[in-house]
Amino acid sequence: MENLSILEQAAKSTSKPSPDAVVAALLEAEKNARKNKIRYSFEQLIGNWQLCFITGTKKTRQKAGIVLGAGRYIPQWIAKIQITYAAEPVAEGEENSETGRVENSVQVGAIVLTLSGPTKFLVNKNILAFDFTRITVKLLGKTVYQGFIRGGEAREAEF
């Protein structure tokens, strides 16, 4: 349970644990979830999440060399990165379908870039699948561009 307190401190405290301690806590939490076959639901993910720490895969870290290291905090004065999961509206009397929408927003100064698209929680695999199909660019709070990306309209219909 110490790993959970390290992760909570990394997310909420001004005195942050070392990046190595956070990576070790993340790996331990992941190992524990697999060992205990912890199952999640889409409902547990719904809401706004702020990204405050990043890691790469071992392969990515090897490619990046010492520049990336094992993990890094994202300074809030550089960028604010937020991801939002929302459930699709369900008609009265219908069962929740484990589908919804995702929005990933990156704010740097007065510019906000948002990628969004459909999500589907694959219960048997305990995985959230998603596809970014739309982009919105805002400058000083005003939308300057909004549209589908990479054949997004067709991909969204197929999802």
Predicted regions and their residues:
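Soluble ligand-binding/transfer domains with enclosed cavities or grooves
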Residues: E2-F159
